[in-house]
Curated annotation (Swiss-Prot):
List of residues that carry Phosphoserine: 71, 301, 324, 432
Cellular compartment(s): Cytoplasm; Nucleus
EC number(s) stated in the UniProt entry for this protein: 2.3.2.27
Start and end residues of each RRM domain: 109-189
Coiled-coil regions, chain positions: 68-104
Bias (Polar residues) ranges: 281-299, 307-322, 425-446
Gene: Cnot4
Name of the protein described by the UniProt record: CCR4-NOT transcription complex subunit 4
Source taxonomy: Eukaryota, Metazoa, Chordata, Craniata, Vertebrata
Pathway as given in its UniProt record: Protein modification; protein ubiquitination
A molecular function GO annotation: zinc ion binding
Length: 575
């Protein structure tokens, strides 16, 4: 039934069905006693019940006692009055809600962020798990690009991130607030909303996805502009943080733990694996000059030992495929919300500081071994603030030119030469003059036929020559060290480089034969006199023999003589 206004302020209702009387029922009185009911109830009593008046218990007549239908003029007048009253009622409500136009209500699940660069002003980007999506499930993200001011870094954008849970919103605020991204400081707080203009006018809002309020909000969360300028809404935010901290003291640790789990606990040294000169893939995050140094460096920093499935580091990089714009000039997976870049946000007064996971010494790289200084990719960091070393850029004092050789190899060879010289100097005094004189008494000097050969008289017996050659390795151990260099009895002219040849030529007397240097000192000619009938190794010789030793290493010749065998390179000529 439609509502019908009466002369009174409140509409007349049927006493039986408690429904407002229609316009036609206003002048309907079925009983002579004057008890007024609606025509619906009158018809029901007469057809389904006893047909008696509920007031006087008299039977209802066939026709109502009083019934005066309204004319068209009266009906139009009543409708106009009804419409006017409705307008007055709406106006009264609008006047009562007019003050709500300047009221803002804090939304517990809404995060308001300012200072975003234009590159990050994308709802789909901010919804990703490596960005705001890491703190909880997001209901909606709205970007506001109509920022009226622009700083030195260009215009910035703001964003409204609506979470499903209020706890996730508070966690995001604590992790994002006061962080520097792209040279801009992000500011995050609980967002406020206003009342819908249709709600203020007491009208139906035509927008199905309207984000404004269409009902009265919490009185404790409602603040006027003056109260917000005084910081009342921030006090309310701190109050919510205190309540959440009391219920769950580790609510911040939950988010941090999940980040470390996804990143495999990467350290700042494991963050980089690509060159930082890619402006489209990297950001500069840092404080002051650190950010400038990172952005200006063109040197890529290798990962210090952790496989890059997440890097830096990590950045380990099981999750390096997704790069957060909140990360530093580094391209790996460490998010702006990690502890390395978090700016301390105020903790609610009266509360102990948030528990933080202790830093173990194992989290920092140890000093490498000396031999690994030129091969290890890990650069030791003296302090956590030494970002140049942490990022692997090295010191600016280090020479940048290439030496072209291995310093370790050159030093090792030079040291070996020095040791060799020292040993040769120690062996020279062992050649005493007495031994040289005794040796010379058994030799004679003679010039044999042909130039360029040394002739020697034969020793008294064959065993003396063998014993003489056996002395050579003992007297001159350096000779064996260089035996692979020479293929004959060759004496190089540079005695300084080979100190084992620095002894006098008469020291060859230990060979029990006369050694006369000739113009060609590359060979020795051993000429045996004819009176001996026994040659080297006990081989009988019929006449004078000329033994020419050539193209045989000294060590091989002496070894064969010691064994009593005839060397294969000895050529015997019978005169």
């Amino acid at each position: 039934m439609s509502r019908s206004p009466d002369a009174k302020e409140d509409p007349v209702e049927c006493p039986l069905c408690m429904e407002p009387l229609e316009i036609d029922d206003i002048n309907f009185f079925p009983c002579t006693c004057g008890y007024q009911i609606c025509r619906f109830c009158w018809h029901r009593i007469r057809t389904d019940e006893n047909g008696l008046c509920p007031a006087c218990r008299k039977p209802y007549p066939e026709d109502p006692a009083v019934y005066k239908p309204l004319s068209q003029e009266e009906l139009q007048r009543i409708k106009n009055e009804k419409k006017q009253k409705q307008n007055e009622r709406k106006q009264k409500i609008s006047e009562n809600r007019k003050h709500l136009a300047s009221v803002r209500v804090v939304q517990k699940n809404l995060v308001f962020v300012v200072g975003l660069s234009q590159r990050l002003a994308d709802p789909e980007v901010l919804k990703r798990p490596e960005y705001f999506g890491k703190f909880g499930k997001i209901h909606k993200v709205v970007i506001n690009n109509s920022t009226s001011y622009a700083g030195s870094q260009g215009p910035s954008a703001s964003a409204y991130v609506t979470y499903i849970r209020s706890e996730d919103a508070l966690r995001a605020i604590q992790c994002v607030n006061n962080v520097v991204v792209d040279g801009r400081t992000l500011k995050a707080s609980l967002g406020t909303t206003k009342y819908c203009s249709y709600f203020l006018k007491n009208m139906q809002c035509p927008k199905p996805d309207c984000m404004y309020l269409h009902e009265l909000g919490d009185e404790a969360a409602s603040f006027t502009k003056e109260e917000m300028q005084a910081g009342k809404h921030q006090e309310y935010e701190q109050k919510l943080l205190q309540e959440l901290y009391k219920l769950n003291p580790n609510f911040l640790q939950l988010s941090t733990g999940s980040v470390d789990k996804n990143k495999n606990k990467v350290t700042p040294l494991q963050r980089y694996d690509t060159p930082i000169d890619k402006p489209s893939d990297s950001l500069s995050i840092g404080n002051g000059d650190n950010s400038q140094q990172i952005s200006n460096s063109d040197t890529p920093s290798p990962p210090p030992g952790l496989s890059k499935s997440n890097p830096v580091i990590p950045i380990s990089s099981s999750n390096h495929s997704a790069r957060s714009p909140f990360e530093g000039a580094v391209t790996e997976s460490q998010s702006l919300f990690s502890d390395n870049f978090r700016h301390p946000n105020p903790i609610p007064s009266g509360l102990p500081p948030f528990p933080s996971s202790p830093q173990t010494p194992s989290d920092w790289p140890t000093a490498p071994e000396p031999q690994s200084l030129f091969t290890s990719e890990t650069i030791p960091v003296s302090s956590s603030t030494d970002w140049q070393a942490a990022f692997g850029f090295g010191s600016s004092k280090q020479p940048e030119d290439d030496l072209g050789f291995d310093p370790f190899d050159v030093t090792r060879k030079a040291l070996a030469d020095l040791i060799e010289k020292e040993l040769s100097v120690q062996d020279q005094p062992s050649l005493s003059p007495t031994s040289l004189q005794n040796a010379s008494s058994h030799t004679t000097t003679a010039k044999g036929p042909g130039s360029g050969f040394l002739h020697s008289a034969a020793p008294t017996n064959a065993n003396s020559l063998n014993s003489t050659f056996s002395v050579l390795p003992q007297r001159f151990p350096q000779f064996q060290q260089h035996r692979a260099v020479y293929n004959s009895f060759g004496f190089p002219g540079q005695a300084a480089r080979y100190p084992w040849m620095a002894f006098p030529r008469n020291s060859i007397m230990h060979l029990n034969h006369t050694a006369n240097p000739t113009s060609n000192s590359n060979f020795l000619d051993l000429n045996l006199p004819p009176q001996h009938n026994t040659g080297l190794g006990g081989i009988p010789i019929a006449g004078e023999e000329e033994v020419k030793v050539s193209t045989m290493p000294l060590s091989a010749s002496s070894h064969s003589l010691q064994q009593g065998q005839q060397p294969t390179s000895l050529h015997t000529t019978v005169a």
